[in-house]
């Protein structure tokens, strides 16, 4: 019985010592929190450490990218990817690109929570449809521009010819109309020589030589 009593007394003294030391430990923890504002992320736990309920160390990989004022960002990232996977992905990326990587993880996690089936693929397909619609619209606009350019080119060709005609009329020139094309003439058909008919030989008229000869003979005749 004496041994058990001594044991209980030792346990009671130990609990009393821990209870007396607890306020001093809490004071030591709270003192650094009232330090300079430049060490906000090293003293005040970041959103990741606050969610995971752990002390935020100075070399915390989440501290520069997950502010304690926006805890919902790391909450969505932790729910989709997990804290350990996010830490590995941030460590694999160069330090100059870690901020962009963290923002990308936040965006992808939010999209995955809104659309658990497709995730980012739904947003990508919607953007691709918009790109195709804009390309079709751009093609239609380019065809309309080409039509207007062709009309302007035709108009520039017609206007100089009209100005030349107007200048010709103003100068008092006479327009000469070209004669119509001549039709091809048919060659004359050859005429065939017909032999003289007997009637034409019998009833041929006397020539001037026969008349003169008849006058001479009538003068030599003497009717006594």
From Swiss-Prot:
GO cellular component, one term: nucleus
One Pfam family matching this protein: LOB
Species, as recorded: Arabidopsis thaliana (Mouse-ear cress)
Residue intervals of the LOB domain: 44-145
InterPro entries: LOB
Coiled-coil regions listed: none
Family, similarity comment: Belongs to the LOB domain-containing protein family.
Protein name listed in UniProt: LOB domain-containing protein 15
Organs and tissues of expression: Expressed in young shoots, roots, stems, leaves and flowers.
Region span, Disordered: 171-224
Tree of life domain: Eukaryota
Compositionally biased intervals (Pro residues): 178-198
GO biological process entries: positive regulation of gene expression; tracheary element differentiation
MF terms in GO: transcription cis-regulatory region binding
Record-linked PROSITE patterns: LOB
